[in-house]
Amino acid sequence: MRLAHEEKKGRYIALITIFVCLFLVFGIRLINIQVVNGDKYATKVASSYSTSVVKAARGQILDRNGVVLVGNRQGNDIIFDASSFPSFSEQEKRNEIILSLINLFEKKGEAWINELPITLDSSGNYQFIEDREKDITKLKSRDMLHLNKYATADDCMSEIIERYSLADFQKQDILKIASVCINMKSNVFNTANPYIFAQDVSDELVSVIKENSTTYRGVDVQISTYREYVDGTIAPHILGVTGAIDAEEYAVLKEKGYAMDDIVGKSGIEKVFEENLKGKNGVKTVKTNSDGTQETSIDGLKNGDNIVLTIDAKLQKVAQDALKRVCDSIGTANAGGGAVVVMDCNTGEVLALASYPTYDLSTYFEDYASLAKNKNVPLYNRATLSTYAPGSTAKVSTAIACLEEGVADASSTKYCGYDYNFLGHHFVCQINHANRTINVRTALQDSCNSYFYYYGGEMLGIDKMNMYREMLGLGQPTGIEISENTGVLDSPSYRASINQTWMPGFSLQSAIGQAGNLFTPLQLCNYTATIANGGTRYEAHLVKSVLSSDNSVSVLEKQPKVVCNTGFSENNVKTVHQGMRLVVTNGSCQNNFGKLDVAVACKTGTSQVEKNINGSKKVYTNGFNISFAPYDNPELSVAVAIEGARSGSSCAPVGCDIYNYYFGNNTSDDSTDIPEDENEEDIYSEGPVDSNLLF
C-alpha cells in the first residue's frame, strides 16, 4: 500500500511540475507580447487588411507609325460576389434577386449575359436554338445537367426547373433565371471566382443597383477594361477580336494564372500574341489603420505589351476603300468579294492586307448574327485563307523557270496560232493575239497560252515547273503570323494523294495557271515580291516589334527573314521584268497603271469557276492582278483578287490607288478606268479544265 501511495504522490508532483512549466512559458510569452512588443501588436490588432485582384491592362496594337489601332477604355461590369450572394441552399432567394435584376436591366434597355441555347416556339413549347449545337452538347454534358445526348429541350428544362426550384415561375421568367443559373455553374461561381452578370453597363444603372444594395444582396460593380478602336473598320481581319474565356480555353490557360472571368484573344493578332497582350494581374492590398486611414499597395502587376504592326493605317484605309470601290463597281450577282495585299519587296513586311466584304470591330458582337449568316462571309479573311486558280499570273513563274532551265532564252520564239495541237488534242489561245511569232517578253505582254504550252508544258515539264514555283512560295506557307491557307501546288504526287491520276494535259494547263493549282492572294503577293527583288523570298510578317506597356523596353524586334535565295540570273529576271512592264506600256493595263507617274510592271490573270447559285451551276470569272513598283528599283508588290471580276485588268485600279498614295502622285482615282472584257488577255482560254483535254 505504501508503494502505491508513493507512486501516486510522484505522479501528482510530475503533473504539478508540468503545469508550472507551462504557466512559466505562457507567462514569458505574455510578457513578450504585452511589454516587450506591446506597441507592435497593438497596432497590428487595430489594423485590418483586405486583398483583391487587379486586372492587368491589355496591351495596345499600333501601326508602324505609332498610330493606335486598338486601345483600352474602362467600363462597369455587374458581378455576383459569392461571399455575400445567397448560397445554393438559398436558391429561392437567388432566383428572386436574379429575376429582379433582369427586370431592371430590361426596363433600362440594357443587355445582360444570356447564353442558354433554349427558347420558346410560337406555341410556347421549349425548343433548342438553331446553330447552337456546341452549347447544347455542353448543356447536356456530365459537368452540367448530366443528361444523355438524345435529351430534348423539354428534358433539359425539366432538370433545370427541379434543380433550381423554378416550378412557380412563368415560362419566360424560367428561361431568364435558368440562363443565369446555368452560366453560374458553367463558370464555376465561388468566392474566388465572381460571376459576371452583365458587361459594360451604364453609370446610371450602376447607381440604381448601388442605391438598392439591400435588394441586390451580393451584387457588386467591377471596373473592367474594354477594347477601344479608333476606327473599327481598319484591318479587322488582321487585328481580330477578344472575348470571354470559354471552358476549353480555361482548361489550358488556368495553369498560366488565368481566371474564369478573363478576356482572351479569339482571332487575329489578339489571339496569336495573347501571351504578350495579356500581361500579369496584380494583388491590391488595402490596410485600414485604427484611425481609419488607409494604405494601399499593388504587387506583381504587369500591364500587357504593345504590339507594333508592319501595317500603315493610312495605306490600309486606301487599300480597303479601293477594293470596296472596284468590287462594288463590278456589281454582278456572281461577285462574292475580293482581297488585296501590299508588301515591302525587300523585307517581307505586309504594309496592307484587306478582305472584302468586311466588318466593324467596334460593333462586332452586336452584328455577329447577321455577319455569320451573310452568304459572302465577311468574317472570312480572303487575303490569307481563300485559294484561287491563279490564271495567267502564274505565267511569270513559268517564264522564269524556262529561262533558268535553259529550255528558252530571251530570243526564243514560238508561232502562236489560235489552235495548239498536243498529242492529237487541241488547246486554244486567245483570239486577240493569234497568228504571230512571239518571244518570252511579248508572251507575257499578250499572255500567250501557246508559248507557255510549248516551253512550259512540253519542254520544261511539271517537275521543273513546280521546283521553281516552290522556290517562289506558291503553294507554300508564307510564315505570316495569323491563320493562312497553304493552297495547292498541283502535281502527280498531289493527284495521287487524292486518288486521282495525273494526265498529260495537266502539265500544259498548269503552265498557264490552271489545272488544280490554288493559291492565296498573300502567296501571289509574296511571289511577286520575290520576282521583283531579283529572287530573294522573305517570310511574310505583320508584326514589326513588341514593346513594353510604356514603350520603354523592346521585347521583340522582328528582322527580315530570308526563306529562299533562288539564285536567279540577273539577265533572266530582267527579261521577265521587261515582259511585265510591257503589260503596262503596250498591253491590257495601259488605261490604269499606264497613267501613273511611277513606273509599274504587272501581270493580269483570269480563271473561270463553277459556282452553285440558287441551286443551279453557273460559271463566273475571277480576276487577278499582280504588280510591283517602281519598275527600276522595286519597293512595293501588290496582289489583287476579285471574285466575279470581268478581267484581270479590271482589278488594276485597286493597285493604282495604292501606288498613288504611297508614291505621292496626284492622279485622280477616276482616271484609273476599269476596262471592258474585250481588253483582257485570256478570258476565253482559262475556263474549267475540259476532260477532253486531259487524255
Enumerate the predicted regions with their spans.
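Solvent-exposed, polar/charged alpha-helical surfaces in well-ordered, non-transmembrane soluble domains
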Residues: 95-99, 103, 203, 207, ...
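Beta-lactam-recognizing serine transpeptidase/beta-lactamase-like catalytic domain environment
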Residues: 70-71, 76, 286-298, 311, ...
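A generic structural motif
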Residues: 83-86, 642-646
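Short, gly/Ser/Thr-rich active-site loops of penicillin-recognizing serine hydrolases
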Residues: 553-554, 559-561, 654-695
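Membrane-proximal periplasmic segments of bacterial cell-envelope enzymes
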Residues: 1-275, 281-294, 299-300, 329, ...
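A conserved hydrophobic secondary-structure block that centers on an alpha-helix together
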Residues: 295-346
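Conserved helix-loop functional segments at active or binding sites
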Residues: 321, 325-329, 356-359, 582, ...
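Short glycine-enriched loop/turn motifs at secondary-structure junctions
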Residues: 191, 301-303, 558-560
